[in-house]
Amino acid sequence: IFETLAERTLALAQLERRKDPEAGFDPWLEDILEPVLEKCLRHGVKIVSNFGAANPRAAARRIQSLAVRLGIRSPRIAVVTGDDLSSDTYLPFFREALGDALDEARMVAANVYLGSDSVADALLDGAEIVVTGRVSDSALCVGPLLAHFGWARDDWTRRGRAVMAGHLLECGVQVTGGYFADPGVKDVPNLFDIGYPIAEVDADGNCVITKADNTGGLVDTRVVREQMLYEIDDPSAYLAPDAISDISNSVVEQMGPDCVSVSGVEGREWPGTLKVLVCQDGGWLGEGEISYAGPRAEARARMAADIVKHRLGGKLDLRIDLIGVLSIHGDDAGRRLARTPQGSARDVRLRVAAVHQDQKVAELVGREVTALYTCGPAGGGGVRAGLRQRLDTLPCYVPRSAIQSNYEIIE
């Protein structure tokens, strides 16, 4: 399983597809597959991944090209379809769900989070590689389990357990200590060589989480429990396209070094709605950065920010951060920075950013920050200016009955 897609990466993929109809899938697809493709085909190891992103058919074509380049046979590839809701058919649902937040003139794409049934069907049809676009992360795990064990599609208990196994595997090494580590509080050994997780799932859907021997990281009950609660609002009702998973009475036990069992998860019938991510044109993000160091560095950085505010404040809503003083805890309007008394920081980087629908206007941010080299306070350096297109992402829900998922075989 290669789980590579997030809401942000899908939005970026939509931008790439707008520029090039053969782009829009994971840009690292070949880097991911090249070391393993021949071995997987030789040993009958199936590959399931959402690296199709905004363009799974193009991803399948790229895999075929990779096989040719490697001098191996062409794999039997299935492309899961049905997540693209960009047609006008679905606009009434989006209008009702999003109201004034939806700007149809700026709408670029919409993708629904599919479940695993088409993944399972494709594997049962002999697919060696299943390429998806937007499916739930856990569906990449549930699909192979449905196909392998032959569970009834309405076996909600087993599906609910499979959802949790997939949830534990999502985001890769989080369940082996990544994102868990906090030095001196939650120590994890050898994060530089962290091992990816393995889920050993039995016919009832219960699982054991472990990792490869002689790798860094940690699998213990603390890590597993933390990942079980990751992004979950209600432990008794984790909503996924495949089932509603209930972990409120689950049992998490240490079975040995880097080996944890999870049992007692329950499942209920899947929700009647599916989540959709609507992407619409968000204009252009212009930004610029410049550093100040030494005595009175903070005062000089604040002066530089004031210069840019005077020059652009009437045209743009500026986000201003003083990295080294206040940045992550700041706000777009700058209220907290304004309330923060000037200190004596000696290593400060000013960042200015703004969004505008007009590319030329957004570009002014980087130009004004660059001008601070000679038109601003003393000792500024290390200027970086950037300009990139943005997409706004709007989540909503549509009736499951309105969605049709399927797959097609590409050989």
Model-derived regions: residue spans:
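Short acidic, glycine/serine/threonine-rich loops at helix termini
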Residues: 11-15, 58-64, 68, 87-96, ...
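Active-site glycine-rich loop that binds ribose-phosphate moieties when present
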Residues: 109-123
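A conserved active-site cap/scaffold subdomain adjacent to cofactor or substrate pockets
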Residues: 159-266
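Gly-rich Lys/Arg/Thr-decorated short loops/hinges at beta-loop-alpha junctions or inter-strand turns
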Residues: 7-22, 41, 85-106
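Gly/Ser/Thr-rich loops at beta-strand to alpha-helix junctions
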Residues: 6-8, 51-60, 134-140, 356-359
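Catalytic or ion-translocation cores adjacent to nucleophile or general acid/base/metal-coordination motifs
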Residues: 69-85, 142-183
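Short glycine-rich or small-residue beta-strand-to-loop segments that form or flank ligand, phosphate
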Residues: 19, 44-54, 130, 349-356
